[in-house]
């Protein structure tokens, strides 16, 4: 498992809305304000840049807002609203490639027109897509594009293992096409493949779940005929075989 440190900056801007109608509470008048919050990353030089390793950010506003749970999917993950009251909100950062999340609380106040809060993240990065996305904002220990390509080749080779003597035994599907089809599947489909393999697992099958590496290894030639047919049908419905 690779732990990557990143610093993100939550930036708040607010001002009194010109011509806005003031709210009155307990004989006190509160002007309506417009405010915005956005999330950026600090690079190694301390400069603000897009948090490219973030998939989306969810803001849980005060329940008096219409649709108080807001999810923003594009950098700088900015939300804009109007209101008169200060309040505490929960913010959730979701990492790329389904690589986890980070939750924290942020208090929206109107003492300053512009202010920011820096948040230190310790990201346990196991997903290849997250590791690659993190390289845009700084160093990632032990990661390189060349290493990722090597891992892809390794997965491909393992899915095709046994092409020699194991091919002597007739199989109910074209094993080469099945191996190619599995390589073309999207991540959500691959998760279903893992589930099908686990549900039909037998003692003769070679299956290895590398949790730390975020990889799932299978020897297709050790799978029973019924599972091969199931996987082939699954792939054929989703990719060109």
From Swiss-Prot:
GO terms for molecular function: histone binding; RNA polymerase II general transcription initiation factor activity. Residues 149-159 have a biased composition (Basic and acidic residues). The keyword Transcription regulation applies. It comes from the Eukaryota. Residues 141-169 are annotated as: Disordered. GO terms for cellular component: chromatin; Ino80 complex; nucleoplasm; nucleus; SWI/SNF complex; transcription factor TFIID complex; transcription factor TFIIF complex. Component of the fcp1/TFIIF/polII complex via interaction of tfg3 with both tfg1/TFIIF-alpha and tfg2/TFIIF-beta subunits. Component of the SWI/SNF global transcription activator complex composed of at least arp9, arp42, snf5, snf22, snf30, sbf59, sol1, ssr1, ssr2, ssr3, ssr4 and tfg3. Also interacts with the TATA-binding protein (TBP). Component of the mst2 complex composed of at least eaf6, mst2, nto1, pdp3, ptf1, ptf2 and tfg3. PANTHER family: YEATS DOMAIN. This is Transcription initiation factor TFIID subunit 14. It comes from Schizosaccharomyces pombe (strain 972 / ATCC 24843) (Fission yeast).
